[in-house]
Amino acid sequence: MELAFEQKQRSCLKRTAHLSLAQEQTQELIIPDAMPDAARTLICYAEPELQSKTSRAGSLLVTGNLRASCLYADEAGGLQLLTTDVPFTLKLESSDLQELTQSVVRCSVRSADSRLINSRKVLLRISVLVQADGYEPWTEEVRALTDAPACLQQKTQSYSNAVPVETAERAFQVSEELNVPEGRAKIVRLADCMLQPVVTEQNLVGSKAVMKGTANLQLTYLDEQNELRTLSLAVPFSQYCQLQGDYEQNEDVETTLLVTGVQLEPVDTETGQKLLFGAGILAQCTVIQPQTLTLCEDAYSTRGDFQPQWQEQEYSMRLDAQTLREPIRPSFPAQASAVLDCRVYPDAMALERTADGVIVHVPLRADTVYTDADGAVQSESFRTEVSCKTALDEDCACEAVFQLQPEGYAAAGSGAVELRYDAVFQLQSFAKQKLQNLVGGTLDLTRQPRAERASVVIRRTGAQQPLWDLAKRYRTTAQAIQTANHLTQPEVEAGRLLLIPM
């Protein structure tokens, strides 16, 4: 007879692309006639803003703008500032990308350089890094045996996995009227405004992804004495993102934030100075759902002739997700009396396999502006790295997301500049497994066992083995062997004398 099966559908999002692309943008700046000649450049700032991301057949097009500025010293040692916007377009290519591919994008600056072409012209070189994951809806039909005859023995196994089931986006604005703290030097001209939005709390409430976070502002500016100053401010925000599905408490949400624009205007008041702040942020939410996959990995019949049909398929299983925090405390030789400003740019990470795991390396570049013992403004760039280690089996894969914490800074020491930052690594480990499932078959019960077939077998086990294997070999059941021998475990130890009912 033909065995009956039911179709069970399992739906999720399948990641079809995991891409990364770095690209250098260049721009020449002409120093206006009203400004003095440049003697040397000190530091270049660049902050990325996303404008659009468009999925196409075979590619993902990401466009944006870099808010860039260059601080230079004139021949008298005074500080001068040039500002500009540098547009960028990156095309990430993959044959697996389609027009309907849903994307989650990260954008960062790898490095920002400035150099003099001549005393009236400056060249900016900015390297921008875009990382993207592409997802598409995927439905799998899993066959399960129904109304199985009592003589048909099944060995089923359940696998738990956390899979993405939905992505959604919400663009929102954060605005606030901020007070410059009392005692701070007045802001005359902004050199840079680095905005780092961070999610501090997120969860799912029905069909909404609710998030709370902080928009962290790091300002660099020139004061009334034309000296370089920094100021850190924070603006809390609370938002939600509408989802298509309605979720319970066992799902999680992962949110990736991108800055789409920043406006900051200093305003003088009778009591001091205020900052009119506004920013655009894009929240990219991914819902992660725990799912259980149950498969019949082996089967046999105690009677008749059983002809099974098997199907093998590869699955990607998420084994672990963890967050690690690592300090960044390197020091570099520099005759600095005070550090005026510091920018740290992370590069693309690299994974190093070890005997018992993997090390995630992130190269870092630190651009510093400081005053020397004579009070002159100097600048230096240093390179270092931060890493973290986690246990990982040889046949598993690891993915990481890196982020610098916003409260970092650099300090001058004895003949050195020390970085004092913290890094956060979000690690996930995966394993690809080829799993077998019973998808069809026939069972002919008219074929009877041989007449000389024994009713009981007595044997001693040579090695520890599962009762399932013994039962399958002698076409009996594991339960019958357990009952006859008063066993409680699914395996039997080596050297055990067994009574095997047939």
Predicted segments, located by residue:
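Primarily a LysM-type cell-wall glycan-binding module
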Residues: 444-483, 488-502
